[in-house]
Amino acid sequence: ATLGIPIAYLADRVSRKKIIIVSLSLFSVMTFICGFAQNFIQLLMARIGVGVGEAGTSPPSHAMIADMYAPNERATPLAIFALGINIGLLIAFLVGGWVNHHYGWRTAFQVVALPGLLLVVIAMFTLRDPPRGLSDGQEAQKAPPLGEVARYILHNKTLRQLIIGSTLVVTVGYGAIAWLPTYFVRVHAMTTIEVGQILALLIGIGGGIGTALGGYFADRLGKCDVRWNLWLIVILALVGLPFSVGAYLATDATLAIILLAFPVSVGALYFGPTLAMLHTLVRPEMRSLASAILLFINNIIGLGLGPLMIGVLSDYFSTDYGARALPYAMVTSALLALWASVHLWLAASTLRADIENTGQTA
């Protein structure tokens, strides 16, 4: 996430296609090398290379998509792009575990790397980098430095609230994903194989459907009122909260799975609309860097604090609640959706005015 910022800084100045190809190549090669690591240091260095390659693909991809589609049509393609996360998780849960069980973790790394190398070749011949600002009908200016982009975001009321709200949503999501396997094993005495199959269906398929539909409905409703891009996230987050609480407190595994289906499906819905509004509010010449800043904050706080918070709360609750400590900790984390909704609602309240200030039509 950290190295995504300098890579995005470069992507706003050179060919985004080349940045994506180089990053994907690095990701795939270093993933393959992970399978040959002989000690912890070698595996750590290879894994760092994987992270650098991963960090360099998303921001320029988001910026290119924003330049290909009109402002009121961006949420859908950005959501479709995000489906890679759900598909990857589905494959990891179903295929990765099987390969690891039968052939070992080294082979699993090598198998995972091969599709990326194939995509590098495909991208070299088919990927096109559109002119910056094409979909906005304006020519991009000279790319600004990092400080100017950071100040632009900080001084924009909508972007401030959007980043805070989306970060809280991500914190809830990362915490849940990290602890759901332990929750099902510890609370419902399920096997790891059973948990893998359930999460593959819930997150891989259910989450993927929710992500795609979120982008679609955000674009459809947003054509009536652009604020629906954010209202949609707020409404579904609030509707999904009781389902999450009920699932974590359920004493029956089947009931917990059924209740989780809805919040997991809409949990990643924020992705398309959030990125669509980000790229509508920033200038074309700063899109890659703005996207990298958003992802950096989302990941550092969401991934850094989300799972940790549940673990700390579970330890704290264990004295008084014993085996129910983890469910109560996950319920507490889920309540952050209320806080997130406040910031996203505030972002919606200033969205139209801030879009008009950019010279576009809200």
Describe these PLM feature segments:
Residues T2-I41:
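Conserved MFS/SLC helix-loop-helix module at the cytosolic interface between two early adjacent transmembrane helices
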Residues S15, F36-Q42, G53, A70, ...:
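Helix-breaking motifs and short loop linkers at transmembrane-helix boundaries and internal kinks
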Residues S25-Q38, A237-T251:
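C-terminal ends and interior cores of transmembrane alpha-helices
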Residues A46-N86:
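Cytoplasmic helix-loop-helix junction between adjacent transmembrane helices
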Residues F81-D129:
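Helix-loop-helix hairpin linking two adjacent transmembrane segments in secondary transporters
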Residues T107-F125, P327-L346:
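Symmetry-related core transmembrane helices of the 12-TM Major Facilitator Superfamily/SLC fold
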Residues P131-I163, V187:
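Juxtamembrane intracellular "pre-TM" segments in multi-pass secondary transporters
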Residues K157-A212, G267-F271, L275, L303-I310:
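Extracytoplasmic gate region of multi-pass secondary transporters
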